Amino acid sequence: DDKLEESIKVQLENRNIPKAYVDFIVLLAFKLKELSKLDAYLKNPTISYEDLETNSSLLTLTDPVPLSEAFKNRIIDLEGGRGVGKGEVAIVLFLRDAKIIGGRKDSDDAKGDVEIQSHAVEIKADKAQLVSFDIASYGSKPTAELKRIFGEDLEITSGTLWPNSVEQYYKNSEDKEEVLNLINKTIKTFYGGHSHVKAIKDSDLEQPSSLLTYLTDQLAISYLKGKNVLMLNTKTDNYILIESEEDYMTNRASGAIKILSFSDKFPRLTYNK
């Protein structure tokens, strides 16, 4: 058993799994009498990046892995400190050529939490922010700033999504052009110019909640450029792998990616399946 444990530890460390998790995984495999099965699987993992693309659940993705459900489910549920979120350990443990590459996200070049067969993947769980790093630190309660821009007569109902209050203000106003200019001033102030969110036109504001949708989608599309993002529903273990703007827009249109809140300057999204 000692040799097996050592062999497993080395393989897990090569995947950059933090030591606390390595010890837990070895202990779990020992308790479930699966050390030799785990060692054999780690030496020859069968699940590929293509399998990740074609599946939509961590449970079905790991179904072919020849280890007990008890073991697999505990690994899928692993999350905790040290910047490791749910799903990360499972993906790097069960997939071929996979390792954790996450850590401090100090620039938009930090493209992922995990790398699988040279594909970097960012993992986003519930209440995800799809917002570029260079503006993400601007998050704060926007009420005072909005009133400074639009005036005290802008009513922001507590508990609503503030873009809907701003949109209502626009629709009720007699000088729509003036309010549209103020909306674009807000976009510029909140999102660092127009590099992430393009200026909005009156034709973009015709549907209900169109400002909310516009801001959310523009921020997400800017963030997703050149990235692969896996959105995970931590309650169901279902996920969507977003590899393009089209993947994102299709899932937003179908309601699979849902806006949870917009309490500061940024939307929080969830994968709703």
What are these regions (language model features)?
Residues D1-K111, H119, K124-K273:
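Nucleic-acid endonuclease domains
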